[in-house]
Amino acid sequence: MSYNPYDNVLATVENAANILGYKPAEYEAVKYPERELSVSVPVRMDDGSVKVFKGYRVQHSTVRGPAKGGIRYHQNVNLDEVKALSAWMTFKCAVADIPYGGGKGGVVVDPTTLSDGEKQRLTRRFTSMISPIIGPDKDIPAPDVGTNAEVMGWIMDTYSMLNGHSTPAVVTGKPIALGGSEGRNEATGRGIMLNTLYICQKLGIDIKAATVTIQGMGNVGSVTAKLLNKEGAKIVAVSDVSGGIYNGNGLNIHAILEYLSVKGNLLSGYNEDGMKRISNEELLTLDTTILIPAALENQINKDNADKIKAKVIVEGANGPTTIEADEILDKKGVVLVPDILANSGGVIVSYFEWVQNLQSFEWTEEEVNSKLARKMSKAFENVYGIAKEKNVSLRTGAYLIALKSVVDTTKLRGIWP
């Protein structure tokens, strides 16, 4: 039986609702996305042929504000995954206390097989097909797996052309020249770094004496590695789609990042003295202080959770741990900082970008990072506090805060008509 990430969401919501003592009628609407859009996207390829790609945009909730969430290009995108990711965005925005609901989008495509022209034509056609339901006050996309600032620029331009005026606030994570925010590119990784420092402080772990392993060296993983390395942590293992590398004495993160900055380079081609090659699976079970899964969903599951030796897990990816794995880790005493808290730095700074666009105003990188640290610290303390008070995991604590916020707002708004 295949794993359905949306079942994970429903189980977590039910658990939080039971602890909060909610009646089913109070949270029933939260269990279902408000809107699911499926589109078939025809694209003329460079060889003159036409390929049709499947695309989705799901708006889970707009109770607290416009839907907010990324667009991913990946060959394994499916509707259940997009639904789960959109729900996680609803709860992530509520935990961070920013005025958004949750949305997510995706196209079933391996972006590495597309030329730049094909990717641009796909993006523009997909944008035109979802344009009726997106907009600065409706639904604001952002980058995700397989997309980046350049793709956001194409979305912004297409939407602006369709509407007859420049609309930078329709997406976040744009290039700076198109209204992007300083600090946005590093925001998710910076948030993970901050949450790692916060939890280490609570547990009495000296970050300079800690060993760290990071699964995934895309934007999130590489920024996290860079910033934790700067804080003095010893990063002993990292990985990407081509596999992982390990050095018990600490990897040369600066050299790795320089190597990976060259387009097309993967870790399988990297070498340094004292390192050995490991698989992604081996990386997850290394004896380490802190494990940061920053790749895709469902990486830590019932099959490997019992083998995990890390004392702390900080979730860089969305949904990297299944419900069954959560229970196993909890029994083992592993402290886990959940995705909807740990990786919310990206959406917090996306909110800052949106605000700057709407006000035609610019903040410096120092201002953005300072505001992010304040928001993140408050969110962490809120989650840590309620988890201690209710004697529950940090994930459950985060969902208690998020669900209460969404349900309270729903009660204030009422259900129309």
Predicted regions and their residues:
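Glycine-rich, N-terminal phosphate-binding loop and its surrounding beta-alpha-beta segment
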Residues: 39-47, 52-111
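Glycine/serine-rich phosphate-binding loop and adjoining beta1-alpha1 elements at the start
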Residues: 74, 94-208
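Flexible, glycine/charged-enriched surface loops at secondary-structure junctions
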Residues: 23-29, 97, 135-143, 166-169, ...
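Rossmann-like adenosine-cofactor binding region
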Residues: 243-336
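Adenosine-phosphate binding glycine-rich loop
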Residues: 2-4, 199, 308-417
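Short, Gly/Pro- and small/polar-rich lid/capping loops
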Residues: 2-40
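Glycine-rich phosphate/diphosphate-binding loop of Rossmann-like nucleotide-binding domains
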Residues: 175, 180-285
